[in-house]
């Protein structure tokens, strides 16, 4: 267990649904102060440049601060607890007070649950500060810090130093050049999801748009809920691939399904008559305004033109391109921020924010979350008959470049079974051959046996989900199931990884396909995911879902 040095005064503070973060957790050596190995001498404490000013900005923003630090020098006899307290007193003398200190006094051989990369210190600090890990940002200088943050569900920001390995930089969800820049990032992201000025009153009917895959619709959920919190009626325009996900989202009163040829991955030729029918259908909504949600590589302007022709008086969207008179609110965001926050920032720019009791994570409408694997034995319940304690492996993906090779997935299933895990393999109706192959080593094959709502129930009942960058990863985030993310680096992990849920990222983050947005792997052998060792997955599952 960790050693906690906590201050009182936070018992009356509860998490607010209007803010992204309640607290910032900071590594000590290399992040707050210069790294002096096994230091027990207060006179050797040297803050990193700009540390005091950066921390004071966090304090001024109302954020609680805690230090989470591995100090194996205690276990090794390099310094005493008294010397450690003296060092920490000097840190506070130079940098100001911290609301909590969480110290792991063990070394790696002890096998404790607190030493980073384990998430124990993060959980302990969040509890001491009266919040949860998902409402914390963690700033550190090495991969252990980022792994601990992700495994707890916190937001990780890496500040590299000369000792940070290149692969740790590549794997980090967010990288800042120094501590002040990390603070800039935290405060910017907090400001981005808050409206500059509150709306004068509730909106009437608002048309929201998110046309793409099921996963894209799911990560837009927080933005849609923000609009719904300030509108009398919300109508969603989505494409055929996103319809099933849209039906699971709260805050939507009506769904219009219509493929958009400038968005769909396999578009039909533009049909003028179809565009006229769409314009007529949009006019029939009689929307008071529209909010067009898109991904960073998509343009809202073609649809904005149709909406103007349909008589929509106010339109908001993210657009780097000059919109002319097509947009009333032209919003811009930097690349790399998580997609749910991107959607929330657009909603905020349009004047909407989440309800005070609503968290900014992913959420489903009336999510069919079982209370136990045997809680509902109805035949239509896909969880009925499954073991009481299982791990899900989902090998498929709508984008081939993001899928772990089937042979490797089969080896992963075999390794998990050998570790004593009960494994359920899931997939769509067109993936039955894939799931049968992957499950052959001892898994339970549910390929093609569930619709999306059924898949939600299976994932919600699992201890952990092993999956690539595809829709089920976002379903897991929405129901709180930890994720072992086999993440191909074709798109940024910090933008598209599982959001605010305990996660371990695996795969070669520096592979040649990095940042290509390739749909089909451009590198022979798919090395970014084919190189994931089954033992790595077993260890990741153990970290996220320790055996009973």
What are these model-derived regions, one by one?
Residues 69, 192-548:
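Catalytic machinery of carbohydrate-active enzymes
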Residues 87-103, 167-187, 250-259, 439-444:
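Structural recognition of alpha->loop->beta junctions
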Residues 43-44, 77-82, 112-116, 267-270, ...:
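Short, solvent-exposed loop/turn segments at secondary-structure boundaries
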Residues 51-88, 97-110, 149, 425-426:
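Substrate-recognition element of Asp-dependent hydrolases with the DxDx(T/V) motif
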């Amino acid at each position: 267990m960790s050693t906690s040095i906590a201050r009182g005064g936070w018992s009356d503070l509860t998490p607010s649904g209007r803010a992204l973060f309640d607290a910032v957790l900071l590594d000590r050596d290399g992040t707050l102060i210069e790294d002096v190995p096994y230091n027990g001498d207060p006179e050797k404490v040297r803050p990193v440049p700009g540390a005091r000013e950066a921390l004071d900005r966090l304090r001024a923003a109302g954020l609680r601060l805690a230090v989470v630090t591995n100090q194996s020098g205690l276990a090794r006899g390099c310094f005493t607890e008294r010397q450690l307290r003296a060092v920490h007193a000097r840190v506070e003398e130079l940098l100001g007070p911290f609301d909590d200190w969480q110290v792991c006094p063990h070394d790696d051989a002890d096998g404790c649950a607190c030493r980073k990369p384990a998430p124990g210190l993060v959980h302990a600090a969040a509890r001491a500060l009266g919040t949860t890990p998902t409402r914390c940002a963690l700033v550190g200088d090495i991969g252990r810090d980022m792994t601990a943050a992700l495994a707890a569900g916190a937001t990780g920001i890496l500040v590299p130093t000369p000792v940070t390995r290149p692969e740790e930089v590549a794997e980090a969800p967010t990288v800042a050049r120094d501590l002040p820049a990390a603070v800039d990032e935290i405060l910017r992201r907090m400001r981005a999801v808050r409206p500059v000025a509150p709306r004068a009153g509730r909106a009437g009917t608002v048309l929201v748009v998110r046309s793409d895959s099921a996963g894209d619709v799911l990560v837009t959920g927080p933005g849609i809920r923000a609009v719904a919190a300030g509108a009398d009626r919300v109508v969603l325009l989505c494409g055929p691939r996103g319809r099933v996900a849209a039906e699971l989202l709260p805050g939507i009163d009506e769904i219009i399904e219509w493929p958009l040829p400038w968005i769909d991955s396999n578009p039909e030729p533009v049909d003028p008559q179809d565009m006229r029918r769409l314009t007529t259908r949009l006019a029939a909504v009689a929307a008071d305004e529209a909010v067009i949600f898109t991904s960073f590589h998509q343009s809202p302007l073609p649809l904005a033109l149709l909406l103007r022709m349909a008589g929509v008086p106010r339109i908001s969207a993210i657009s780097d391109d000059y919109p002319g008179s097509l947009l009333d609110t032209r919003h811009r965001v930097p690349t790399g921020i998580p997609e749910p926050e991107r959607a929330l920032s657009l909603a905020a720019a349009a004047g909407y924010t989440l309800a005070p009791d609503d968290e900014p994570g992913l959420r489903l409408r009336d999510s069919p979350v079982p209370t136990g694997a045997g809680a509902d034995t109805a035949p239509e319940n896909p969880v009925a008959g499954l073991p009481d304690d299982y791990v899900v492996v989902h090998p498929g993906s709508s984008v081939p470049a993001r899928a772990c090779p089937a042979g490797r997935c089969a080896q992963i299933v075999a390794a998990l079974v050998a570790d004593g895990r009960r494994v359920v393999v899931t997939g769509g109706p067109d993936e039955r051959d894939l799931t049968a192959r992957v499950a052959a080593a001892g898994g339970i094959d549910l390929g093609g046996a569930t619709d999306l709502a059924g898949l939600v129930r299976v994932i919600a009942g699992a201890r952990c989900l092993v999956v690539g960058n595809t829709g089920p990863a976002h379903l897991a985030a929405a129901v709180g199931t930890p994720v072992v993310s086999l993440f191909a680096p074709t798109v940024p992990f910090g933008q598209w990884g599982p959001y605010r849920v305990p996660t371990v990222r695996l795969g070669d983050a520096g592979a040649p396909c990095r940042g290509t947005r390739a749909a089909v792997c451009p590198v022979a052998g798919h090395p970014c995911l084919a190189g994931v060792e089954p033992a790595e997955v077993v260890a990741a599952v153990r970290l996220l879902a320790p055996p009973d």
